[in-house]
């Protein structure tokens, strides 16, 4: 059994709420939060706090090796670097992103930066193989290159998902062995 703080998204969290959560997190649980899912997330953060979403969450002490950042569609190169620097995990939710018409993240840039990327659904579906298929098509569509994603997407689903789950469950999961 494991727990995390579910924070929803930057645009729903005041500085006071983030401070309260940090102070309440005496057990050093992880956080999961939607990050830059829509372009409006970045606009909101810049207008209210003068910072892009990832930088705001960094300054508020939310990013780190026990944080799962969902989506990260509208992050720029500096934000990708900050996610890597803090060892924050990113979960790509391709069907949810398409269904909400919010865009597609630059999975290849994040992968090349060395970010721990996993594949999720954000509750849009329960079929991870369908998410795999959609993610594979979407990375090709976004990059304009039909030969992309063949290594990255399987790694996200079959390796990184189980490693991230194992990190929080404190157990090896997702491997069939003798």
Language-model features: where?
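Generic alpha-helix signal with a bias toward terminal, lower-confidence helices
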Residues: 17, 45-47, 79-81, 87, ...
């Amino acid at each position: 059994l494991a727990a995390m703080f579910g924070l929803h998204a930057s645009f729903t969290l005041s500085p006071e709420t983030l401070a309260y959560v940090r102070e309440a997190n005496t057990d050093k649980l992880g956080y999961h939060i939607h990050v830059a899912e829509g372009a409006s997330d970045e606009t909101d953060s810049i207008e209210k706090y003068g910072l892009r979403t990832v930088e705001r969450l960094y300054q508020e002490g939310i990013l780190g090796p026990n944080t799962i950042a969902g989506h990260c569609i509208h992050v720029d190169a500096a934000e990708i670097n900050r996610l890597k620097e803090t060892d924050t995990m990113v979960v790509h939710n391709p069907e949810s992103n398409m269904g909400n018409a919010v865009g597609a993240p630059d999975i290849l840039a994040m992968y090349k930066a060395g970010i721990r990327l996993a594949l999720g659904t954000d509750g849009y579906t329960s079929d991870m193989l369908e998410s795999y298929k959609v993610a594979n098509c979407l990375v090709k569509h976004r990059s304009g290159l039909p030969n992309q994603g063949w290594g990255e997407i399987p790694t996200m689903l079959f390796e990184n998902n189980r490693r991230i789950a194992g990190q929080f469950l404190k157990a090896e999961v997702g491997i069939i062995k003798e």
